[in-house]
């Protein structure tokens, strides 16, 4: 028999905080996106380096990733919400470590950090050799 999951009110409406959640960091070479979800996967807040005001090549810097991580969890801290979180990182970008350091400094207790970067198992066939 399936267990019933109690419905949690949305933080966007300001009803209540989320005591435990998951912080997703997607770090590409061009941008860093930080999404905070509850345990069920419902997005609570998000931020990106581009949304924080960085434009062009400055979006791919570690400082922009740090700013994005701080903005994503600032709303949760203001609501008195998240006490414990898990970090799931994806991508090879330069801002992944800086974003996780910013989250660690915010006071949220981290249970674990997981890296789910997709790795090819031999990948696509390369293009044929160039003959000059």
From Swiss-Prot:
SUPFAM superfamilies: Translational machinery components (SSF53137). InterPro entries: Ribosomal_uS11 (IPR001971), Ribosomal_uS11_bac-type (IPR019981), Ribosomal_uS11_sf (IPR036967). GO terms for biological process: translation. GO terms for cellular component: chloroplast; ribonucleoprotein complex; ribosome. Its main location: plastid. GO terms for molecular function: rRNA binding; structural constituent of ribosome. Keywords: Chloroplast, Plastid, Ribonucleoprotein, Ribosomal protein, RNA-binding, rRNA-binding. It is found in: Plastid, Chloroplast. Transmembrane segments: none annotated. Belongs to the universal ribosomal protein uS11 family. HAMAP family: Ribosomal_uS11. NCBIfam families: PRK05309.1, uS11_bact. Part of the 30S ribosomal subunit. This is Small ribosomal subunit protein uS11c. The lineage of its organism: Eukaryota, Viridiplantae, Streptophyta, Embryophyta, Tracheophyta.
């Amino acid at each position: 028999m399936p267990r019933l999951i109690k419905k949690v009110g949305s933080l966007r409406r300001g009803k209540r905080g989320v005591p435990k959640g998951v912080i997703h960091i997607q770090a590409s070479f061009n941008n860093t996106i930080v999404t905070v979800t509850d345990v069920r996967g419902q997005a609570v807040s998000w931020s990106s380096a581009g949304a924080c005001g960085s434009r062009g090549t400055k979006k791919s810097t570690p400082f922009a990733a740090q700013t994005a991580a701080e903005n994503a969890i600032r709303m949760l801290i203001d609501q008195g919400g998240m006490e414990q979180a898990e970090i799931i990182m994806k991508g090879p970008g330069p801002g992944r470590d800086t974003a996780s350091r910013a989250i660690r400094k915010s006071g949220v207790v981290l249970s674990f950090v997981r890296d789910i970067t997709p790795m090819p198992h031999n990948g696509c066939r390369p293009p044929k050799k160039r003959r000059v």
